[in-house]
From Swiss-Prot:
UniProt key word Nucleotidyltransferase: yes
Organism: Aromatoleum aromaticum (strain DSM 19018 / LMG 30748 / EbN1) (Azoarcus sp. (strain EbN1))
Family: Belongs to the bacterial CoaD family.
Binding site for ATP: T11, F12, H19, G90, L91, R92, E100, Y125, M126, F127, I128, S129, A130, T131
Keyword Transferase attached: yes
Localization annotation: Cytoplasm
A GO BP annotation: coenzyme A biosynthetic process
Entry-linked InterPro entries: Cyt_trans-like, PPAT, Rossmann-like_a/b/a_fold
PANTHER family noted in UniProt: PHOSPHOPANTETHEINE ADENYLYLTRANSFERASE (PTHR21342:SF1)
The protein's name: Phosphopantetheine adenylyltransferase
Lineage, opening ranks: Bacteria, Pseudomonadati, Pseudomonadota, Betaproteobacteria, Rhodocyclales
Amino acid sequence: MKEGVAIYPGTFDPFTRGHEDLVRRASLLFNKVVVAVAESHGKAPIFTLAERVEIARDVLAPFPNVEVTGFDGLLMDFLRQRDARLILRGLRAVSDFEYEFQMAGMNRKLFPDVETVFLTPAEEYMFISATMVREIARLGGDVSKFVQPAVNERLLQKVSLKR
C-alpha cells in the first residue's frame, strides 16, 4: 500500500543513476514523490537551478507519480507550502548517516510534524556521489556509468566550456 507524499530534496548537480534509482524505488512506496531541487547558495554548482530541474525532469519522465521542481530557501518552508510531512533521503555510507541524522533532528526541531525516511541505494550505486561525478568529469574522466547518456552529454559540454 502506497503512502502520501515524499519530498526528496537535493542539489542534484548532476542528477546521477543513484538519484534515479532512489526515486524509482520511492515511486513504488509513495503516492507522489516530489524531487525538490535546491538553489544551493553555499555551493558552486556546475548547472544552474533551471538546468538541474530540466535534467531531473528528463531523467524522471517515465515515472508518472514523480514531480520535479526547484526551490530556494528553507526546506521546512517548502514542506509547509506543499503541506508535506515526509522527507526522503538516501544513505550511502556511515558518513552519510551522521550528517543526515543531525539534519533530521534539526528539521524536526523546526517542524515537529516532519519525518525523515532513509533509503539505502542499490548495491551498484552505493559509491556514486554527485560531487565525485563532477570532479571526475572536470578532470576529463569517463562518468557515463554514473549518469544517463543525456546527462553525460550535458556534463561534458559544461566541463569543456570551463577548461
